Amino acid sequence: QLEAMVGGLPIRGPDAVVSELADEAGQAVLHATHDGYLKRFGLLHARRLRLSPAGDKLDGVDILEPPKGKLRLKQDLPYAIHFHLHPDCRCTERERGTCKIMLSDGQVWIFNVEGAALSIEESLFFVDSAGPRPGLQLVLRGTTFGETAVRWTMHAENPHVLV
């Protein structure tokens, strides 16, 4: 066990996590927040996800902000939002802020971001007992001075071929 080797969890988790799931006009909406970056960086993180009724489009927004009552951080902070892909996925960058994700079953999804720079980078997949496997991740980078909203969307290129 990794925890036993390092004497605890390798990364300290947040103290407060709040989530709410709702149905809004037939769309599943999840809103979640945590304070995992508060002590070290002075930021709270919130994510809002909206899934279409057909399951062919996922809209998201990640919000980084200081606690209420604080207008600005002492300095601008760089951030990186990571989306790790399964090792069987292939990914190619298209125009700026957009990439194409190809699944092993032939499905194709388009990922688009506003408010951050998109890059495709190497990653490791640790989920199964076979050990780590190389994979890819989408990384959204930018700088925040106090409050930043990064909006992104993932949708099926051909919704009628969803399995």
Positions of PLM-derived features:
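CBM-like, beta-strand-rich accessory domains located in the C-terminal region of large
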Residues: 1-163
